[in-house]
């Protein structure tokens, strides 16, 4: 009777109905009796129209499965009432993000399965709320990286599946933890073993995969891989290659090679700064100036046979502005290393000694050659990059910036001062027949022949006051074989040389000239021409007048005498133009027979004074 009353009381309270009313309408619930007599509830929700986790999940649920639904996100603390939850399965949903509060209150959780979702990141810090978690399944998601701090929340795991994601590398801290697995706090009776799934990821096979490759070789006895044959995804040359076939080296931070720390170079020279470093992977090399100014040169990169990286800074023509400190940096993902190289650009006071062919350098070309007042070698200086020549110090001029440019020493008769390749013989044959053409007292023109030169061959002209060291350089456009030097001082002796740009002239390409001689020679020629013309005019004018007068007199005589003149065969009296004993010209009378002879002689315009021949004076007569 008492049993019947109890049943009626339970029915009145609706006990059985209330117990099953906790199961969500879109889910199925089941109750299991465990071996120790306790009960475990399992809730399975697989409705494809489900977009959020159900709100009325029984609090005594031990296993919750939300699978193949349209759930995109899990709000924070959704599962906090499920304090008895031990297994949380969320496979093949549309999850793209998880809250860091999602696992709040799940202190007894041992399994968390999230395969087949769209997770790009995972809230690793949320695992601190699950101290008993042993299984984490994240396969078939979109994870691309694992942060180094994740290692602090994975120490107690015995199963971790990261396969079929977008992982390219693993943090070194995590690999080091796996290589030195220790006894877990909840598995103190036996050694911890970790089952690891890393297959089907696009691994980048470089030095950062060195530790993982060695883990696969069995260095960690407590590490078990679901699939041990991992393959490279990149670089392209290693795509598809198994880890077991790789020969990787351990990563190393950049280490600079010792070298020159200070360079002193003359103005206008070419400077090559070189810096080398080692590292794995090969470091990226770069140059910069300590003062922040831009580089005035070209950077080249090289890799030597031993794997060292080299960078070269080429400064073609250094100036005083290039002086300073240059910083070479070698950098890879492990760090950076720097070194400092100081460059000092100076104006040398003495020439640099070179080995050259002995012998006198300068000699004047042509007749009347004059030996130059130089020793075996001439040391000179030139101003680099002067667009137009300026007057030398011998001629007062307005101060100019161009004139204040520093001069550079070079040795004239040393092959290779400007060029390292062409020989002296080749350069000598290039420029031939150098000549000076006069212009004015302040300018001169040079012409030469270059039969072996091409349309792209450019020449340079070096000139200076004879006997001085300071030389100036002019650049001649490619293809031209003449140039005019302006700004010269009048009545001054100069020396000028023509050579292929970048080469040193030899004595065959040099000429000595004087501005007054050039102009005076041309003026003298003009004066001679004028004197010759004047003398010819003076000599030819009197005979011409005499001939005209004689013709006029004959005509008058004809008119007077009529036909008697023809009968006698005589003409008017002729005058003799000869030389008197004192050398002066005189006029005299002659006979008619002598007149006939003179009229048949050569024209008076061609007559000349023949001088004294055979001891007696020879006179020629004109009319």
UniProtKB/Swiss-Prot annotation:
Its main location: endoplasmic reticulum. Residues 22-526 are lumenal. Residues 266-332 form the Ig-like C2-type domain. It is a single-pass type I membrane protein. GO terms for cellular component: dendrite; endoplasmic reticulum membrane; synapse; synaptic cleft. SUPFAM superfamilies: Fibronectin type III, Immunoglobulin, L domain-like. Residues 548-623 are cytoplasmic. Homodimer. Interacts with LRIT2; may form a heterodimer with LRIT2. Interacts (via its N-terminal extracellular domain) with metabotropic glutamate receptor GRM6. Interacts (via its extreme C-terminus) with the scaffold protein FRMPD2 (via the third PDZ domain); the interaction leads to their colocalization in photoreceptor synapses. This is Leucine-rich repeat, immunoglobulin-like domain and transmembrane domain-containing protein 1. It comes from Rattus norvegicus. The lineage of its organism: Eukaryota, Metazoa, Chordata, Craniata, Vertebrata. The gene is Lrit1.
